[in-house]
């Protein structure tokens, strides 16, 4: 796995405390224990079993004190991660221990990001706060007066709005209009400072990225304020890649995070498709079957999937290649309908218990209920 990730020991400079294989083991330990980075380092210093698992020895007199080393390793692996090559490597290792390689079970789930529930007010206020803070910093560095605006008045109104238990729609709309107008003014004031003193100011790459996101937020909020629908909606300034995913569940109608279409082979799950934008998993059944056949080199004979996969295109594909499914029958019954009914029942029962149960196990015991990574690549690695 370390070779597949492109990790190697340094030939020059100070020797790494963690070897390439130890870095992979540390990430596995992180997911298994559910510890924070600081807690993981503390347990690693004092637990000989964790050290043996990672293949390192930490003397009590020289413990690891910098817990950010876990984050550095996570970013290093995330920048080199290739999910397909990793899964092919793991599948080749697990294949001798697996049975029923001809059965493909598939379903989609959402692994939520650890973020506050997004609202228009929160998004606008985060944009205003960041922009005003940087305008003040620019003026302080240049030694010029701050431009006049209504930031303090809007801040007081927003604080009063947040403290209210019952919020009238008319008051909320008035405050939203004021925040949109103020955001437009702050952007124009910032652009004015840049046009006059841009050569004296230094901007980072993160600054430009955050500024472009705020401009998109302003455009989207103006569109929604005028009653128009917005596609590809931004729900977080920090995690600008996250999009709302409508799930239609009783407890959570909308979720925010990575939507993943999984296949399961004898209890082992593999990622077929991952996206932070909503997608229709029903059209991906053919890709799931092809992926399993590529990983296991065994022809798929049975498919267990949810009703969303039971469209006409998938039914024709499975009929063409002689694949039995768990889909509810359409049309007249065949001669061997009792046997097919038993097979459909077994496939549906297996999918509902093992596949959907694995989602709960991952989220409860492997730190996937709320992913706390801070950027897109590390969130995929998590």
Language model regions located:
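Active-site- or DNA-interface-adjacent structural scaffold in DNA-acting proteins
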Residues: 57-239
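Basic, short loop/linker segments at the boundary and entry of helix-turn-helix/winged-helix-like folds
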Residues: 1-25, 338
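Alpha-helical support elements that line or immediately flank enzyme active sites
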Residues: 24-34
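Basic, amphipathic alpha-helical segments enriched in Lys/Arg and hydrophobic/aromatic residues
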Residues: 206-207, 211, 221, 225, ...
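Short, conserved catalytic/metal-binding motifs centered on acidic residues
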Residues: 26, 40, 64-70, 102-112, ...
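Acidic, metal-coordinating catalytic cores used for nucleic-acid/nucleotide bond scission
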Residues: 14-18, 48, 304-312, 332-333
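Electropositive, glycine- and tryptophan-enriched low-complexity nucleic-acid-binding patches
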Residues: 249-295
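Flexible, glycine/threonine-enriched loop-and-boundary segments that flank and lead into catalytic domains
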Residues: 236-251
């Amino acid at each position: 796995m370390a070779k597949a990730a492109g990790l190697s020991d340094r030939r020059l400079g100070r020797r790494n405390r963690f070897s390439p294989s130890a870095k992979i083991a540390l990430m596995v330990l992180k997911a298994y224990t559910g510890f924070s980075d600081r807690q993981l380092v503390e347990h690693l210093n004092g637990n000989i079993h964790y050290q043996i698992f990672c293949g390192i020895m930490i003397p009590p007199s020289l413990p690891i004190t910098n817990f950010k080393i876990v984050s550095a390793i996570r970013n290093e692996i995330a920048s080199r991660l290739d999910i397909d090559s990793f899964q092919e490597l793991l599948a080749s290792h697990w294949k001798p221990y697996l049975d029923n390689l001809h059965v493909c079970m598939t379903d989609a789930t959402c692994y939520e990001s650890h973020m506050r529930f997004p609202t228009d007010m929160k998004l606008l206020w985060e944009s205003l706060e960041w922009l005003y803070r940087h305008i003040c910093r620019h003026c302080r560095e240049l030694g010029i007066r701050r431009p006049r605006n209504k930031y303090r008045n809007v801040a007081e109104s927003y604080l009063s709005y947040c403290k209210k238990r019952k919020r009238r729609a008319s008051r909320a709309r008035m405050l939203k209009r004021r925040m949109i107008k103020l955001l437009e003014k702050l952007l124009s004031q910032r652009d004015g400072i840049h046009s006059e003193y841009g050569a004296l100011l230094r901007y980072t790459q993160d600054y430009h990225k955050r500024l472009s996101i705020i401009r998109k937020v302003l455009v989207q909020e103006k569109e929604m304020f005028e009653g128009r629908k917005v596609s590809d909606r931004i729900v977080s300034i920090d995690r600008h890649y996250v999009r709302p995913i409508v799930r239609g569940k009783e407890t959570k109608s909308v979720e925010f995070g990575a939507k993943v279409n999984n296949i399961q082979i004898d209890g082992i799950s593999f990622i077929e498709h991952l996206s932070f934008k909503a997608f229709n998993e029903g059209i991906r059944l053919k890709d799931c079957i092809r992926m399993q056949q590529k990983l296991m080199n065994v022809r798929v004979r049975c498919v267990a999937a949810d009703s969303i996969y039971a469209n006409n295109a998938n039914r024709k594909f499975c009929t063409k290649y002689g694949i039995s499914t768990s889909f509810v029958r359409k049309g007249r019954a065949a001669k061997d309908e009792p046997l097919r009914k038993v097979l459909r029942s077994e496939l549906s029962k297996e999918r509902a218990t093992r596949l959907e149960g694995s989602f709960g196990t991952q989220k409860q015991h492997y730190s996937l209920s709320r992913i706390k990574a801070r950027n897109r690549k590390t969130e995929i690695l998590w």
